Amino acid sequence: MNSKAKKRVVLPTRPAPPTVEQILEDVRGAPAQDPVFTALAPEDPPDPSPRAEDSEIQQEQIYQQSRAYVAMNERLRQAGEALRQKFDGLRQAGQRLEQDISQVTSATS
């Protein structure tokens, strides 16, 4: 009368995975309109011959991006140098402060 004691259902064994040859045969035999090939395809294929105007615009955009990158790189280099100089100044000020503190403590002793 124990309802918790149910019989276990024995599942069939798993089939072996397909071999590479079987997969390739399946892919080669699939039609071109198979959802596997069309699901991720773009709706409109890109124009095979881009217009010269589009190419020039794209080249100009890339050129401007390159110029902006070079300018930003130079600004970062300058900022790094300024930061190093300020760090050195603070370190020297800290050393002077320690010297002054030691002089004051030795003078008061």
UniProtKB/Swiss-Prot annotation:
Keyword Coiled coil: yes
Keywords assigned by UniProt, alphabetized: Coiled coil, Phosphoprotein
Region listing for Disordered, in residue ranges: 30-62
Coiled-coil segments on the chain, per record: 73-104
Modified residues (Phosphotyrosine): 63
InterPro entries: UPF0449 (IPR028227)
Pfam families xrefs: UPF0449 (PF15136)
This protein's record includes keyword Amino-acid biosynthesis: no
Protein family membership: Belongs to the UPF0449 family.
Name of the protein in question: UPF0449 protein C19orf25 homolog
Taxonomy of the source species: Eukaryota, Metazoa, Chordata, Craniata, Vertebrata
